[in-house]
């Protein structure tokens, strides 16, 4: 883990201190992480025409989503952002295998690109994962022995920064770390009161480590509010301890001057699976994240 982290520091330094000349493209880089609602369950077939094609001036490095202990987590390539980076997306680090789904990255990139920003997204997410050891279908605990999703995220960041020409135009690019977008917490809210109680401390620790990996200690952080569909029989909650996680998310963003809490998710409709938002929800989510990113850029200096 330390070897990966140190490698990130070296390669980021190369990018950040490159000579800035007028021929270099400048990209704002955002790390997208979390569990399945960051993966994305929107259907490409239901997208409006404005989002069905490639988003101009927007690139993505979508790290391969591999579970704990497997060697290929985080491999990937830079590619133009288009639908297909949602649930069941795969890559071998040479070719991307786009899926029939999309996540919040699509409308996020479209919203910022329309404002004239060159957007570069580094994405690593994995469904069902928690910050608390023993919860979910894998976790992000940096102190866990062996490789886990935190390590895969670091590998994704390192691999993304290993390429100094992300749009393959023959000129080195300047990559400016601009934010972290985090959509996660359902696994911790559904596991136990203990995992929910630990969420605030775990979230603080992980966000600061990802900030360090992106080489900016005050990097803006955007937290998406998790929600409960109550679509289990008799209206039972899918996440019995969600109130505690909500308090943690709210506390983190209120006490960090460079963080924002996106609560718009409260109004999104769920799909029939009871856990994931519908297509319209994922479009609105990306737009809300982009709005928060623009606000933090103005207010977090």
Language model regions located:
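Bacterial Sec-dependent N-terminal signal peptides
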Residues: 1-24
